[in-house]
Amino acid sequence: MYQEKTAGTKNAFTGKPNPGYATYLPIQSSLGRPLEADGLTGDFKLITQRDISHCKSRTIVDYWLLAIEPENGVIINKGDADRLGLKDGDRVKVVSATNPEGVWDFKNGVKKPMIGRVQVTQTVKPGVVTFNLGFGHWATGASDVTIDGKVVKGDPRRAAGIHLNAAMYTDPYLKNTPLQDPVGGSAVFYDSKVRLMKV
């Protein structure tokens, strides 16, 4: 199949023509370079998931759900955990090639380390780590906020757990932009690689 309309367009980053036929385009930097060519490597592929008890970021404010699952963790295959000497409940920092500090930097003087508890399972493929979305907040009532000179105290239960989007790769040339899928243009959520450091 050939699509003339697509074949007549160019990649906005590289200036190269887009293929007008079905093909696989690997995830790449904005300059069209393979991730490995820019040093974007690691030990584990990082993916995200949702759990039925906390399916959205806003569910952290639901104390009935917090009673069921008060904290998420860094989910890892048992074979990988054994190889690294990790067990359930151990704390690890998650780092990547574009976030070697393993922190969320809010650019206001506040940083939050990406440290979470290990959850060992057989439900994740070896070489992959994942985490349930909806945890690791710094807002949504998790931190103190000053309103009209009065401090509204945050609830530390809302800050529990870990959120790892900041470990996902940023484009090595654009710096402050996530890697983008060269076809769909969305952020690349499943191609970052990370390392786990026991703390």
What are these regions (language model features)?
Residues 1-64:
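Long, low-complexity segments enriched in small/aliphatic residues
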Residues 6, 62-199:
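Long, contiguous, secondary-structure-rich segments that constitute the structural scaffold
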